[in-house]
Structures are given as structure tokens and as C-alpha cells.
């Protein structure tokens, strides 16, 4: 198992270049330049952290196994119970990450590519603290492996985990647990990890070695996941590359690519991503309800919403039959649902269009609304519902009672839903307004 000769050589070149630069510093220039001084201090802090951080393989393995064991033995996971144990595990892994002295440019680079936002490794290490998300995925992957084991494949189960980040938090803890408990051997399962960020690949490769999991890992690939090809079967795909409202990151493009690589009897996790739309008051949704409770949505708030219906279900059946329309060399779209806006009393004031995401990880386990950073509702600020903006902006879409909205999912550097108004709704709209005494 390796990250590839090219990654290793690039890593050595970067590290050597950094050492050469610091070998004979121009202290007067550093003193004048606050950015240079800041970079130097960051480097020193990181190296001090590395000196003070013992290689805690024993404690890291023990805490990981304890955390996974508690997840697998708990029928219903609760965020407030998981969080303390996961935070403790995060601190240990964060110390290890700091001790690697990965050059700052490889840790902090964050950019937008043709398929969406690519988060920096420094940002990705914190996602392990999204406790219920991590817990449900670990529980789901374990259940999915048990199901796949019944298929009696003639080869080890091959799991592919694209966009895995530096810690691969949705799978690596399970591998640690399996090895420690003797549950699955490397002859039964092996894994390919993929991440486009070199810093993430370096960190993950080091963590795999630190935990002694090399025999389970087929490769740690530092490539664009959409370019990954393999001649052998893929039996399971684990993918979570999205932000709230199924936006910003390239999950759908990646999911389509790996669905096409998956064995006919393979499993894709999450099994379903359910996106719905509603109309709500932004002030009530995002401000007022959290003044008294910051853990879950108020039932009163849920009742105040005007539910429009399902926008999109992303599951294996959809991915294997997904029809894309090419708009230009940079953008492809997928047509989703058309939903009608019911009658809105003009006195109600403006409404905000919200996209809601729920994630069915595996079986009956769902990651619900507000239970994770990826399941917070996303407002579409360009859709003006039941009002005319005082300061119109490019892209504003004015809609109201009786209008039908057709949603498209855009796959480009800014992935997410595009809302359009359907012309064929005009007749229904006029009838609705007339029935409510608002016709012309």
C-alpha cells in the first residue's frame, strides 16, 4: 500500500524546498513582512506540537475501538452521548495530524474545481466532530458489510471511499476495530481511499501506517475521484461530499461515476439522499426558534412551513438511470421535480424557499434535519416568494400563489439546485387567484 511514487516524490520536494528556505532565513525581511512572520510562527507552532506529541498508537487504537464498540452496541444513537467520546478521539487524531509537519500549502489549500468546492485538509479534519453523522455511517457500513458477506463473493470485498479526507472518518475507525477484534481479516475486505488533496493523502497514509492497517488498504490514491478506474469489482462505495441543501461540493457527479463502477450486487452508502422543498419565514426559521433551543427544530416551526414536496431522491436506482443535459462545456443539468406553490395570502408577507436534506445512511437509519451540518435547511435567496424586492438583483426570480417551480440540479463548479418558473402554470394560477378573490 502506498500513495504512489509521484505523491511521495512531490512530498519530498515540498519538504526539502521548505527546509532549504528556512536554512538561511533573512531575518530582517521576515521582521518587515507580517505574512512571512506569520508563516514562520505557524511552522514553529506546528513543529512544537510535533515535539510534544508522543506517537499515541496504543491510546489512539484503544479509544477508537471503545468508540466504535459503543456505537455498534447502541440501538439508537444520540448526538449528546456520542459527542464527548468523539471529541476526545478527535483531539488525539488532531495531535497526530499536527505531528506530521505537513507543509502549510498542502494543509490549507482550498479551491473550486470543475465539479465543486474542494475543502482544505485542515478544514476536513474537523468534520470528524459531526458526531451523529460519523456514528450513523460507521453503524451503517458495519451493517452493509454483514449483508455483503452473505453474497459469497469469490474475492475479498473491495470498498472504495472517495473524498475521504485526511482521517477517512466514515470507515477507518471500523477497520481499526475489526483488526483489534479479529472480525474481518485483510483476506475478507480491502479498501481504496481517494482524495484529490495531496495533504489529505499524506496524512491518511501516515495514519493507516500508525494504526497498522496497511494490509487492509489496497491504495491511498491522490487523484480527482472522477478519474478513478479499476479493472476489479467494487462491492461498496462510501461517499459523502456535500454541504447543506445538497450544495457546493461535487457529490452528485462523484456518485454517478462510482455508481457506474459498482458491482450489480454492490451497495452504495448513503442509500438515499432525500431533498424536499418548503416555504418558510427566514426570520422565524434561522433566528427566532434558536433563541430558546439550539439542539433541534421546534415543532411549531415545522408546522408553520408550507411543504411543497419532493425535489430529488439520490439513490442507486436514480444514479444508474440519471439523464444529464449538457448546457455547455462546463455545466450539465439534471431535471428534478416540478412543484406548485399553493395560495398565499398577500398579508402573510414574504416567504423563503428552503431546501431540506435527509440522509438514509443504511437500512432504517436516517440522519435527520438539523442533526448534522449537512442536513441544515438551505435558503434560496434568489427566489422571491410573495414579494417584490426593493433592490432587485441579477438572478432574482419573482414567484407567488399558483406558480409552478421546476428544479434542476446543476453540475459545475457551483453545484446545487436552480429554480425556474414553469410557464404552463399560468392557467392554474389564474383559477387559484380567482377562487380566493384576487383575480383581475
Where would I find each of the regions flagged by the language model?
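Conserved class I S-adenosyl-L-methionine
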Residues: 153-167
Amino acid at each position: 500500500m502506498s500513495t504512489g511514487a509521484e505523491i511521495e516524490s512531490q512530498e519530498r520536494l515540498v519538504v526539502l524546498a521548505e527546509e532549504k528556505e528556512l536554512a538561511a532565513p533573512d531575518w530582517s525581511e521576515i521582521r518587515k513582512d507580517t505574512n512571512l512572520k506569520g508563516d514562520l510562527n505557524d511552522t514553529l507552532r506546528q513543529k512544537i506540537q510535533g515535539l510534544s506529541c508522543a506517537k499515541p498508537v496504543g491510546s489512539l487504537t484503544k479509544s477508537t475501538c471503545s468508540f466504535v464498540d459503543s456505537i455498534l452496541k447502541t440501538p439508537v444513537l444520540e448526538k449528546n452521548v456520542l459527542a464527548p467520546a468523539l471529541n476526545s478521539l478527535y483531539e488525539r487524531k488532531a495531535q497526530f495530524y499536527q505531528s506530521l509537519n505537513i507543509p502549510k500549502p498542502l494543509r490549507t489549500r482550498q479551491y473550486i474545481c470543475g465539479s465543486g468546492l474542494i475543502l482544505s485538509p485542515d478544514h476536513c479534519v474537523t468534520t470528524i466532530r459531526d458526531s451523529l453523522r460519523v456514528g450513523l455511517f460507521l453503524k451503517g457500513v458495519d451493517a452493509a458489510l454483514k449483508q455483503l458477506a452473505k453474497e459469497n463473493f469469490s474475492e475479498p470485498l473491495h470498498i472504495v471511499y472517495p473524498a475521504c479526507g485526511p482521517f477517512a472518518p466514515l470507515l477507518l475507525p471500523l477497520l481499526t476495530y475489526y483488526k483489534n477484534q479479529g472480525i474481518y481479516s485483510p483476506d475478507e475486505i480491502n479498501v481504496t481511499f481517494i482524495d484529490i488533496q495531496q495533504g489529505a493523502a499524506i496524512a491518511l497514509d501516515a495514519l493507516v501506517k500508525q494504526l497498522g492497517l496497511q494490509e487492509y488498504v489496497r491504495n491511498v490514491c491522490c487523484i480527482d475521484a472522477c478519474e478513478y478506474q479499476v479493472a476489479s469489482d467494487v462491492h461498496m462505495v462510501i461517499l459523502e461530499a456535500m454541504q447543506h441543501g445538497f450544495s457546493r461540493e461535487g457529490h452528485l457527479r462523484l456518485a454517478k461515476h462510482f455508481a457506474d463502477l459498482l458491482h450489480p450486487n454492490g451497495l452504495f452508502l448513503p442509500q438515499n439522499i432525500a431533498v424536499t422543498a418548503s416555504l418558510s419565514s427566514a426570520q422565524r426559521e434561522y433566528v427566532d426558534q434558536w433563541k430558546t433551543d439550539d439542539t433541534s427544530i421546534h415543532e411549531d416551526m415545522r408546522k408553520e412551513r408550507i411543504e411543497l414536496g419532493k425535489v430529488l431522491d439520490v439513490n442507486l436506482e436514480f444514479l444508474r438511470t440519471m439523464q444529464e443535459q449538457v448546457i455547455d462545456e462546463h455545466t450539465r443539468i439534471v431535471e428534478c421535480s416540478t412543484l406548485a406553490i399553493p395560495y398565499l395570502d398577500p398579508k402573510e408577507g414574504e416567504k423563503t424557499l428552503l431546501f431540506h436534506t435527509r440522509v438514509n445512511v443504511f437500512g432504517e437509519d436516517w440522519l435527520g434535519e438539523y442533526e448534522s451540518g449537512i442536513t441544515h435547511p438551505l435558503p434560496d435567496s434568489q427566489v422571491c416568494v410573495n414579494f417584490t424586492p426593493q433592490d432587485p438583483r441579477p438572478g432574482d426570480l419573482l414567484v407567488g400563489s399558483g406558480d409552478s417551480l421546476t428544479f434542476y440540479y446543476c453540475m459545475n463548479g457551483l453545484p446545487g439546485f436552480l429554480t425556474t418558473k414553469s410557464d404552463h402554470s399560468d392557467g392554474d394560477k389564474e383559477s387559484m387567484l380567482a377562487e380566493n378573490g384576487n383575480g383581475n
